[in-house]
């Protein structure tokens, strides 16, 4: 049983739309000049992160979940529930839909559904996202996709650093070029591409689309994901609540000074996206820097964070 923060070593994924921002911004060693994703806190079979410190050093997060459920407050479930990513969107990502739990369970061999959310760490001027569509029925959705009426179909939204978007399963969506994003999502890789700008993969073939599944899984008409943001300030910290939903709750902690904290959840997932500081508990001190990702376990004692830094924090 551990009462210490559990730091994770990320896994990186090359993507046709990726770049070098994960290296340039966070100092990571990335596999190529087209690195799109950092699976920062992951217990997904396609890319589990590894414990970097303490008594469980060297174990994957999958192994830790399976062998030491007490670390996570005894939370039930076959699969660790969440996945935290950093996304370097140098070029447009594909337009896609993710299924809900029921559809994924029926069609994706045990995958969870995929509700997700985005925190915009940084973006270029006039950057945007695709969030939803204008179709009023599935018949109209099919017609507009088949005719390539993307301008008429897609809802485009301008974004800026600090924005937050909740993306429920069934939402037609895409991140567009020029964005650096922290994504919190259900622990799933179920994705149905609708359109990919006719790009070719590394073998020179068009990337696979999943038209029928995407239409089946899509929410029609579009419904915006509901968020109810609030802000609380006290000595040393400002906490912004972005969403408290069925699958996860997500917050931003802005530390400026020294903040006293308590860990009251089954576990907390933490990512340092800016600045540096010290996490102190009992007689121990852990340095924190931009690009660190860690879990605060169920048995974590009260602690303080001292410094100037920003964290995105989530729990189930």
From Swiss-Prot:
It holds the Pfam family MPI_cupin_dom. GO terms for biological process: carbohydrate metabolic process. It is an enzyme of class 5 (isomerase). Zn(2+) binds at residues 98, 116, 173. Its EC number is 5.3.1.8. GO terms for molecular function: mannose-6-phosphate isomerase activity; zinc ion binding. Its cofactor is Zn(2+). This is Putative mannose-6-phosphate isomerase YvyI. It comes from Bacillus subtilis (strain 168).
């Amino acid at each position: 049983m551990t009462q210490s923060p559990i730091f994770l070593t990320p896994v990186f994924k090359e993507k046709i739309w990726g770049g070098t921002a994960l290296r340039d911004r966070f100092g990571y060693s990335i596999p190529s000049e087209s690195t799109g994703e950092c699976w920062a806190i992951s217990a997904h079979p396609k890319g589990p992160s590894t414990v970097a410190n303490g008594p469980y050093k060297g174990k994957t997060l999958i192994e830790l979940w399976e062998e030491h459920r007490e670390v996570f407050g005894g939370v039930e479930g076959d699969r660790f529930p969440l996945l935290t990513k950093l996304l370097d969107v140098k070029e447009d990502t594909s337009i896609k839909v993710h299924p809900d739990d029921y559809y994924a369970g029926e069609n994706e061999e045990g995958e969870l559904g995929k509700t997700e959310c985005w925190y915009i760490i940084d973006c270029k001027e006039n950057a945007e996202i695709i969030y939803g569509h204008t179709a009023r029925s599935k018949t109209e959705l099919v017609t507009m996709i088949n005719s390539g009426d993307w301008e008429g179909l897609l809802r485009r939204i301008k974004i800026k650093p600090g924005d937050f978007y909740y993306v429920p399963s069934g939402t037609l969506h895409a991140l567009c070029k020029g964005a650096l994003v922290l994504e919190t999502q259900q622990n799933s890789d179920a994705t149905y591409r609708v359109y990919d700008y006719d790009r070719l993969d590394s073998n020179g073939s068009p990337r696979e689309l999943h038209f029928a599944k995407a239409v089946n899984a899509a929410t029609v008409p579009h419904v915006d994901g509901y968020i109810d943001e609030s802000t609380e300030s006290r000595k040393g910290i400002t906490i912004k609540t972005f969403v408290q939903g069925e699958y996860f709750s997500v917050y931003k902690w802005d530390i400026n000074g020294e903040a006293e904290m308590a860990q009251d959840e089954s576990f907390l997932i933490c990512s340092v996206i800016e600045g540096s500081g010290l996490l102190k508990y009992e007689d121990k001190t852990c340095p924190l820097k931009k690009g660190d990702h860690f879990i605060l376990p169920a048995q974590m004692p009260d602690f303080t964070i001292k410094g100037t830094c920003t964290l995105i924090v989530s729990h189930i």
